[in-house]
């Protein structure tokens, strides 16, 4: 077996050269980070779950006309994706106050926002991914006006779809992050959705209990990260022995069933 050439390694994934020109293999790791990688750890099986969830979400988004980099899942931890020129902007879509917006503006966590809010952050770990305005994006040429129109339009469409998808399994989509890239056809380019959509980059709360089913369990030392990620996958029908989405999730009881305190 020939050794694959590594293209890039991030906090949660590794990108390898793909089997055909214009493709990459995206490998999902179990590594977990928070606070711009100041906190590090491992969530066992996270890469496998995130691979499945992201495959499921990207496939469904493609069905409603959202262009993405996803081609197909290769195995438990890898998927084949289109190679894209990543736009250095992290797009955060917020429906309910939580995380940094609560700290910045003094809004109580859990308060529904008057309307969906889109924020932009410059992707630079050394700078701590600072929040930016559209004027910064235009000034420094990170994306054109037309690309930003496509990005904001797709972000709203993705949010509308995901809110409904998660509500159907008794989960509130509090906020989430998206990344976009360009693919080229000669002198012309178009914007596509890239990276992943999983509990790593979404805040997901059980509608009944308020339990956090995402990486906040790692950020806040709440424990039960593995069970929370698995619960999201189970409700989406991605795990065997699916008990259906109608059950109320009680993380304490779930851990006891697994022999944990």
Curated annotation (Swiss-Prot):
SUPFAM superfamilies: SAICAR synthase-like (SSF56104)
Reactions performed catalytically: 5-amino-1-(5-phospho-D-ribosyl)imidazole-4-carboxylate + L-aspartate + ATP = (2S)-2-[5-amino-1-(5-phospho-beta-D-ribosyl)imidazole-4-carboxamido]succinate + ADP + phosphate + 2 H(+)
Any single GO CC term annotated in Swiss-Prot or TrEMBL for this entry: cytosol
Keywords carried by this UniProt record: ATP-binding, Ligase, Nucleotide-binding, Purine biosynthesis
Example GO molecular function: ATP binding
PROSITE patterns xref list: SAICAR_SYNTHETASE_1, SAICAR_SYNTHETASE_2
Pathway: Purine metabolism; IMP biosynthesis via de novo pathway; 5-amino-1-(5-phospho-D-ribosyl)imidazole-4-carboxamide from 5-amino-1-(5-phospho-D-ribosyl)imidazole-4-carboxylate: step 1/2
EC number: 6.3.2.6
Domain of life, source organism: Bacteria
UniProt xrefs under Gene3D superfamilies: ATP-grasp fold, B domain, Phosphorylase Kinase, domain 1
Enzyme class label: ligase
Alphabetical list of InterPro entries matching this protein: SAICAR_synt/ADE2_N, SAICAR_synt_PurC, SAICAR_synth, SAICAR_synthetase, SAICAR_synthetase_CS
Biological processes, Gene Ontology terms: 'de novo' IMP biosynthetic process; cobalamin biosynthetic process
UniProt key word Nucleotide-binding: yes
PANTHER family with a match to the protein in the record: MULTIFUNCTIONAL PROTEIN ADE2, SI:DKEY-6E2.2
UniProt-listed NCBIfam families: purC
UniProt similarity note: Belongs to the SAICAR synthetase family.
Protein name: Phosphoribosylaminoimidazole-succinocarboxamide synthase
Organism: Novosphingobium aromaticivorans (strain ATCC 700278 / DSM 12444 / CCUG 56034 / CIP 105152 / NBRC 16084 / F199)
């Amino acid at each position: 077996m020939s050794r694959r050439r590594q293209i890039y390694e991030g906090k949660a994934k590794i990108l390898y050269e793909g089997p055909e020109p214009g493709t990459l293999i995206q490998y999902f790791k179990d590594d977990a980070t928070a606070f711009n990688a100041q906190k590090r750890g491992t969530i066992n099986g996270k890469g496998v779950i995130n691979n499945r969830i992201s495959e499921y979400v990207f496939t469904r988004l493609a069905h409603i006309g959202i262009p993405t980099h996803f081609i197909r899942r290769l195995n438990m931890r890898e998927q084949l994706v289109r190679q894209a020129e990543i736009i250095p902007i992290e797009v955060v879509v917020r429906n309910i106050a939580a995380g940094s917006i609560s700290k910045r503006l003094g809004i109580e966590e859990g308060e529904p926002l008057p309307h969906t809010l889109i924020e932009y952050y410059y992707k630079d770990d050394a700078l701590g991914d600072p929040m930016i305005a559209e004027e910064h994006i235009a000034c420094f040429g990170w994306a054109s006006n037309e690309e930003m129109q496509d990005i904001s339009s797709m972000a709203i469409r993705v949010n509308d779809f995901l809110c409904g998808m998660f509500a159907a399994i008794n989960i509130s989509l509090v906020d989430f992050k998206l990344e976009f890239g360009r693919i080229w056809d000669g002198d012309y380019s178009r914007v596509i959705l890239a990276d992943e959509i999983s509990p790593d980059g979404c805040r997901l709360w059980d509608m009944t209990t308020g339990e956090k089913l995402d990486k906040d369990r790692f950020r806040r030392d709440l424990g039960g990260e593995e069970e929370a990620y698995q619960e999201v996958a189970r409700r989406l029908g991605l795990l065997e022995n699916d008990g259906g989405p109608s059950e109320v999730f009680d993380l304490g009881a779930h851990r006891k069933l697994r022999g944990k305190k």
